[in-house]
From Swiss-Prot:
Keywords, ordered alphabetically: Ribonucleoprotein, Ribosomal protein, RNA-binding, rRNA-binding
Cited InterPro entries: Ribosomal_uS4, Ribosomal_uS4_bac-type, Ribosomal_uS4_CS, Ribosomal_uS4_N, S4_RNA-bd, S4_RNA-bd_sf
GO biological process assignments: ribosomal small subunit biogenesis; translation
Xref: CDD domains: S4
Protein name: Small ribosomal subunit protein uS4
Highest taxon, organism lineage: Bacteria
Signal sequence range: none
Family: Belongs to the universal ribosomal protein uS4 family.
């Protein structure tokens, strides 16, 4: 399946919640009818079956992190192999992706923009260029903007936007240096309460 390139707000309307696919300059409910699905019959809200609810939750999380279906399934398999709670393991793996860490540190306004920065070799990890968005960042890794990319206006603008967002406690960022440290693995309480990972586990456990 190809990566979705259509209107980002349509995806948020489909899931009925802000997926943080836009820059966050304005609240998403001022841009669109978030409670109404796209399409002619979007105002109708059919009652979902258990399977439907599980599928919608999986799609929502997959779209938040910009993951393709096959990738997402592989993350679930890895989460299931690890010790502990499978659902929480899944979220931790997704949060540890380099493109997500770049976004969380404020170097990009969206995860899609962060993915582009990584792919274009604008990001270094422990002093080495890494251009793989799915690269797993480890505790104490230093993630920074490459020296020759620090003049990019969009990175500076993103750092200004990041000042308006809640700062992740598991990261330590020096905005002036455009670098940060992955201090610890995030706990479930650190992450969005709007995600019900248990539904995803139920879906894949069938």
């Amino acid at each position: 399946m190809a990566r979705y390139l259509g209107p980002k707000l349509k995806l948020s309307r489909r899931e009925g919640t802000d997926l943080f696919l836009k820059s966050g300059v304005r609240a998403i409910d001022t841009k669109c009818k978030i409670d109404t699905a796209p399409g002619q019959h979007g105002a109708r809200k059919p009652r979902l079956s258990d399977y439907g609810s599980q599928l919608r939750e999986k799609q929502k999380v997959r779209r938040i992190y910009g993951i393709l279906e096959r990738q997402f399934r592989n993350y679930y398999k890895e989460a299931n192999r690890l010790k502990g709670n499978t659902g929480e393991n899944l979220l931790v793996l997704l949060e540890g992706r380099l493109d997500n860490v770049v976004y969380r540190m404020g170097f990009a306004a969206t995860r899609a923009e962060a993915r582009q920065l990584v792919s274009h070799k604008a990001i270094v990890v422990n002093g080495r260029v890494v251009n793989i968005p799915s690269f797993q960042v480890s505790v104490n890794d230093v993630v920074a903007v490459r020296e020759k990319s620090k003049k990019q206006a969009r990175i500076k603008a993103s750092l200004e936007l990041a000042e308006q967002r809640e700062k992740p406690t598991w990261l330590e960022v020096e905005a002036a240096k455009m670098e940060g440290v992955f201090k610890r693995v995030p706990e479930r309480s650190d992450l969005s309460a709007d995600i019900n990972e248990h539904l995803i586990v139920e879906l894949y456990s069938k």
